[in-house]
Amino acid sequence: MTRIIGLDPGMSKTGWAIIDMDERSNIEFLGSGTISTGNKLGMGERLHVIFEQLKKVISLYSPSEAAIEKIFVNKNPKSSLTLGYARGIVILVLEITELTMNEYDTNYVKKSITGNGHADKDQVIFMVKQIIKNLNIKCHHAADALAVAICHVYTKSSYFVR
């Protein structure tokens, strides 16, 4: 059994999802959530919240592998830079906790889940709910994290060719 944490880094909201994958690549959903920092805190405080909360999630679930979305360049350079800070903290936590990190482009994740690399968020959520039956996930950040984790399973299992 392999336990995987999927991560969708963000400064305001960092989505996470935990799944187990058995030797036949069957997926069992264990949990998901969002680390919210709010915008009233300073930059350093927000990064510290992400750091501490993600460490707690990893400690609680003890995943053996991590899957994270690669950063994309936004039209707004400030947004891209801020996302980079949050992503850097997530990578630091993965390094500190000695988790193997696997990075995936957003379009690759979408293609592996929906068959369309340019699918919108609703299409991704719809397909994630088809893959994980009886899933009640409300936040798209957690759904994105789950999609990244599922993408990792598909990639490891050679179900999907890049």
From Swiss-Prot:
EC code: 3.1.21.10
Any single GO CC term annotated in Swiss-Prot or TrEMBL for this entry: cytoplasm
List of residues binding Mg(2+) 1: 8, 141
Annotated catalytic residues: 8, 69, 141
Record key words, sorted: Cytoplasm, DNA damage, DNA recombination, DNA repair, DNA-binding, Endonuclease, Hydrolase, Magnesium, Metal-binding, Nuclease
Keyword DNA-binding in annotation: yes
Pfam families: RuvC
Transmembrane segments: none
Catalytic activity: Endonucleolytic cleavage at a junction such as a reciprocal single-stranded crossover between two homologous DNA duplexes (Holliday junction)
GO biological process, one term: DNA recombination
Keyword Repeat among UniProt keywords: no
Predominant location: cytoplasm
Co-factor requirement: Mg(2+)
UniProt cofactor note: Binds 2 Mg(2+) ion per subunit.
Matches recorded under CDD domains: RuvC
NCBIfam families: ruvC (TIGR00228)
Family the UniProt entry places it in: Belongs to the RuvC family.
Protein role: The RuvA-RuvB-RuvC complex processes Holliday junction (HJ) DNA during genetic recombination and DNA repair. Endonuclease that resolves HJ intermediates. Cleaves cruciform DNA by making single-stranded nicks across the HJ at symmetrical positions within the homologous arms, yielding a 5'-phosphate and a 3'-hydroxyl group; requires a central core of homology in the junction. The consensus cleavage sequence is 5'-(A/T)TT(C/G)-3'. Cleavage occurs on the 3'-side of the TT dinucleotide at the point of strand exchange.
PANTHER family attached to this UniProt entry: CROSSOVER JUNCTION ENDODEOXYRIBONUCLEASE RUVC
HAMAP family, A to Z: RuvC
Subunit structure: Homodimer which binds Holliday junction (HJ) DNA. The HJ becomes 2-fold symmetrical on binding to RuvC with unstacked arms; it has a different conformation from HJ DNA in complex with RuvA. In the full resolvosome a probable DNA-RuvA(4)-RuvB(12)-RuvC(2) complex forms which resolves the HJ.
Protein name: Crossover junction endodeoxyribonuclease RuvC
Organism, as annotated: Wolbachia sp. subsp. Brugia malayi (strain TRS)
Gene: ruvC
